[in-house]
Design a protein with these regions (language model features):
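Conserved beta-strand-loop-alpha-helix junction that forms the acyl-donor binding cleft
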Residues: 105, 131-141, 157-163
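Terminal substrate-recognition subdomain of acyl/acetyltransferases
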Residues: 161-174
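Acetyl-CoA-dependent GNAT
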Residues: 2-105, 114-116, 120, 170-172
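Glycine-rich phosphate-binding loop
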Residues: 108
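Residues forming the Rossmann-fold NAD(P)(H) cofactor-binding site
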Residues: 111
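Conserved acetyl-CoA-binding loop of GNAT-fold acetyltransferases
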Residues: 145-154
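Conserved GNAT acetyl-CoA-binding A-motif
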Residues: 121-132
């Protein structure tokens, strides 16, 4: 599996890749029903995904990382370095979203993407990473805890005020 940044071309999001990403988002209607990020999780459009990605990339230090296996887009991570609100605390990076093609769940792609993101932060000299998991998503909470993340506090997300648990993982050397 390879992880590569999704980079706008002349300020625009490349159409063919955007179509692939929209298809990835569309497989995850169950997650988007929980998150409320789209008006109709069963009909996510390319335009809605383009806006969601543009909103993510508008934050300083934000990146969208695409995960490919055998040339196929199998996942995506939206990351932010440093984490939101880091001015008040440790300067740690943040995984804002990790999305895996729902038709390939339980194939190890989520774990592989999380590991690659962590390795990327470790290589950049970061000692820990954080994520917020929506409280209404116990499967995601179980996934992240299985990856070694521990709950550190309860919070409301900045976008929609949804209840979530902030989790953190120390990134060991090597």
């Amino acid at each position: 599996m390879i992880l590569q940044p999704f980079v706008p071309v002349d300020g625009a999001l490349p159409g063919p890749v955007l179509t692939e990403i929209a298809a990835l988002y569309s497989t995850n209607h169950a997650f988007f029903e929980l998150s409320g990020d789209f008006p109709d999780p069963n009909r996510i459009t390319v335009e809605q995904v383009a806006q969601a990605l543009a909103d993510e990339l508008a934050h300083e230090g934000a990146e969208i990382l695409l995960a490919r296996s055998a040339g196929r887009l199998v996942g995506l991570a939206a990351v932010l370095d440093p984490a939101p609100g880091s001015a008040d605390g440790p300067q740690e990076p943040w995984i804002g979203l990790l999305l895996v093609d729902a038709t390939a769940h339980r194939a190890g792609h989520g774990r592989a993407v999380a590991t690659l993101v962590e390795e990327r932060f470790r290589a950049a000299g970061r000692s820990a990473v954080q994520i917020a998991v929506l409280d209404n998503n116990p499967a995601a909470s179980a996934f992240w805890q299985a990856q070694g993340y521990t709950p550190v506090r309860r919070a409301k997300d900045r976008e929609r005020g949804r209840a979530c648990t902030v989790m953190r993982k120390a990134l060991a050397d090597g």
